[in-house]
C-alpha cells in the first residue's frame, strides 16, 4: 500500500472516531432549555432592539418567565403583549407609558457626511441599513424599527432619528384594536303545527 493511501484511511478513521465522540458528547451533555422561554421568544418580534431594557428578545423572554411584566416591548405592540399575557396567564396591561408616548422614529443617514465605516450596518439588528465599506449607507425606512442602536457607533455622528407621521402611504389598520363581539348561533326549535 502506498503511504498516501494509508494516510487518507488513517485520517478518515480519526475523523469518524472524533465525529462519533462529539455526537455522543452532544447527547450526553445536552442542556435542556425552558420550553416556556422558547414559546415567549417565538412570540416576541426578534428585533433585538433593547427598548424593553434587556439586550435582546431572549433575555426579555427569560425575564418574563421569571415574573417580569409583559408590557415592555414597543415593537411588538399591543397584539404581542396580549399573546404574552395569555401564555403567562396574567392580565394584559397597557403598553409601557414611555413606549406609548413616543412617536415612531426611523434612522436617517446624512449621506453626504457618511464615511462608509459600516459600524451602523453591524449595529442594526434587523438589517435595515444597506451600503458597503468606504461607500455611503442608507436606511430602508420600511424595515427600520427605530431602535436607535445605530446612532451611537457612528464615528461622524451622521445618523438622526426622525419621527414618522402617519399618512395615506404608511397608515394601516390596527385590526387587533377593533372591538369584535362573537355571537354564537343557537339551534332553533322546530315549530310544531
Curated annotation (Swiss-Prot):
* GO CC annotations, alphabetized: plasma membrane
Check the record and name the PROSITE patterns matching this protein.
4FE4S (PS51656), 4FE4S_FER_1 (PS00198), 4FE4S_FER_2 (PS51379)
EC number assigned by the record: 7.-.-.-
Give residue ranges for domain 4Fe-4S: 32-90
Q: Specify whether Translocase is a keyword of the entry.
A: yes
- Region of interest (Hydrophobic), ranges: 1-26
In terms of PANTHER family, this protein maps to: ION-TRANSLOCATING OXIDOREDUCTASE COMPLEX SUBUNIT B, OXIDOREDUCTASE
Its subunit composition reads:
The complex is composed of six subunits: RnfA, RnfB, RnfC, RnfD, RnfE and RnfG.
Q: What is this protein called?
A: Ion-translocating oxidoreductase complex subunit B
